[in-house]
Amino acid sequence: MIIRTEHLVKTYKQKGGDRKRVVNDVSVSLTQGEVVGLLGPNGAGKTTTFYMVVGLVRPDEGRVFLDDEDITRLPMYKRARRGIGYLAQESSVFRRLSVADNIKLVMEQNGFSSAQIKARTQVLTEELHLEKFLDKPGGVLSGGERRRAEIARALSTEPAFILLDEPFTGIDPVTIEELQGIIRNLASRGIGILITDHNVDATLSITDRNYILVDAQIIAEGPEQDIRENERVRKFYLGEGYRREGLRGEVPSSASD
């Protein structure tokens, strides 16, 4: 399966009545098993583009497709039923519910049986090392534990894609490394991952491809090294003095590594 956008355009009304084009003719794609970054400076249009893929924002022009189906006007919950999962930047765990009940609630809403819920919960909590947190309410989890619980809940419905909004925000370097390993592991199992994040190094080090937006338009596309060496990207996004030695290193394959 593939998610793709064609020539997305979005404008917003400014003070004084003028309209500003915040996304201008943006086309991106994401296939299953691929990790793709959507990056750029503040105000570049990356978040608006991301939200149009998610279904939170409707484009003024252009279309969003899942394979050959036009899903541009499809609400988020219907996109979810077609296999497009979404993790928001803000905490989305139900704070008073246990980790197990967080997973159970989502699966019940999607028509899974009690037996399926029990089996799937066991698999996910073992995979994401959440066994000892099963009965703990979401409100007492640390940032990294919460992220893993949110991922477990998103995976419970067996999506083909997961769209991650600022997944590396608010967590420490060790937890970032664990999360990177989880993301690469999901991709190796055929799940497509789209990431938008301000943490450039954490994102570029695990992506297969990246789109860089500046002033509402894509100025570059490619793998990590191409992005880091692109003169326009360095000028308008990374900065001329940007340095990072040893481009792609080994990323743990799971949270236990």
Mark where each language-model region is.
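The feature captures the beta-strand-to-loop junction immediately N-terminal to the Walker
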Residues: 39-41
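Conserved catalytic motifs of ABC-family nucleotide-binding domains
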Residues: 158
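Helix-to-loop junction immediately C-terminal to a conserved catalytic motif
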Residues: 54
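Conserved ABC ATPase signature
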Residues: 137-141, 145
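ABC ATPase NBD coupling module
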Residues: 70-85, 90, 114-118, 224-231
